[in-house]
Structure formats: C-alpha cells, structure tokens
C-alpha cells in the first residue's frame, strides 16, 4: 500500500529483456535500506525489487503490466515517480493507493490557473464513471483531488511543489499517465 506522496524522482538507468522486462532505476534512496522483495511504486504500478546497488535498484515488469500501463513506453533516461511502501504508524498524507493501475489516461490540455496548472485528462470509458468530483485519483502514482468531471474527462490542479518534485513538471498535452 502507498499514499500517493512521491518521495523521490528517479530515472530509468537501463531496460533489458530477460523473459520479463528488467528495469534499473537510479534513485536517491539509501539502497542499503531497501530489501530484495520490497515493493516500490514506480510512476504508479507497485513493482518488486529484484536487485540493487549503490544509488539504483532493479525491478522486473511483466508483459501484462507493460501492456496495461505506460511502462511499455519507458526508455533509458525517463523520469520516474517513486514511493516506498507505507509503514504502519506513518503519516497518510495522500490517500490509500494500491499500486494496481486501473488504466491509462491522456492529457488533453494543460493551462495556468492561478499559481497552479489545470490538467484535463481523458479517462478510459469503462473507468470514467468511477471518477468523482472532489474524490481522489492517483496519476503516475501522485495522489490528487479531482476538481472537475465531465463525461469521460476530469481535471486536477497541480501546484508548484508537485511540479518540482514529480514528473508533472515535464508532462504535456498528449502524454499518457497511469490511473488508479
């Protein structure tokens, strides 16, 4: 389980096909504190650590995850929102996030709104009815409040802190994000 509060902005170090896809991710986490078998949310999906070294860890990504998330489009150098699994007794600053992505949403617009940016998304039709005004969504693993809903579309506001510490700082119209 996760909170949707990103604690590191990692970078894909390498991608290798070995049956499943092995992805190495650079991180500022102290990898001495990461156990093999630990769960880390990587831009939304919960992935299992299978290897690690100083400043990086590796995960294996199944064909199912590649097909149903944005991870199939990752390349070396891509930025990745990272969150370690929550621990009992820690602050729940976002909302409860499972790391089981429901689908992929596409950014249809991004416009300034005060000091934030309003991102509008198009959600998969079979999932859109579950998105509620003032409810919570996790987009690329980031816990956000839904500020508008219309048809299959919904909007969220991204404050400057979120832009600076997540991949929302580089996302643009046409980009796709993992939706939970």
Model-derived features with residue positions:
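Conserved loop->alpha-helix
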Residues: 1-180
């Amino acid at each position: 389980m996760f909170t949707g509060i990103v604690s590191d902005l990692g970078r894909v170090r390498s991608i290798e096909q070995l049956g499943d896809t092995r992805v190495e991710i650079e991180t500022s986490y102290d990898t001495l504190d990461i156990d093999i078998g630990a769960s880390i949310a990587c831009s939304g999906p919960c992935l299992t650590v299978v290897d690690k070294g100083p400043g990086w860890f590796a995960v294996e990504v199944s064909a199912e995850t590649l097909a149903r998330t944005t991870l199939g489009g990752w390349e070396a150098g891509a930025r990745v929102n990272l969150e370690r699994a929550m621990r009992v007794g820690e602050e729940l600053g976002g909302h409860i996030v499972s790391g089981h992505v429901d689908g992929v949403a596409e950014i249809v617009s991004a416009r300034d709104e005060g000091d934030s940016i309003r991102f509008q998304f198009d959600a998969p039709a079979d999932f859109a009815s579950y998105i509620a005004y003032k409810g919570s969504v996790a987009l690329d693993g980031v816990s956000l409040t839904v500020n508008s809903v219309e048809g299959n579309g919904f909007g969220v506001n991204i404050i400057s802190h979120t832009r600076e510490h997540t991949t929302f700082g580089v996302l643009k119209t046409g980009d796709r994000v993992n939706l939970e």
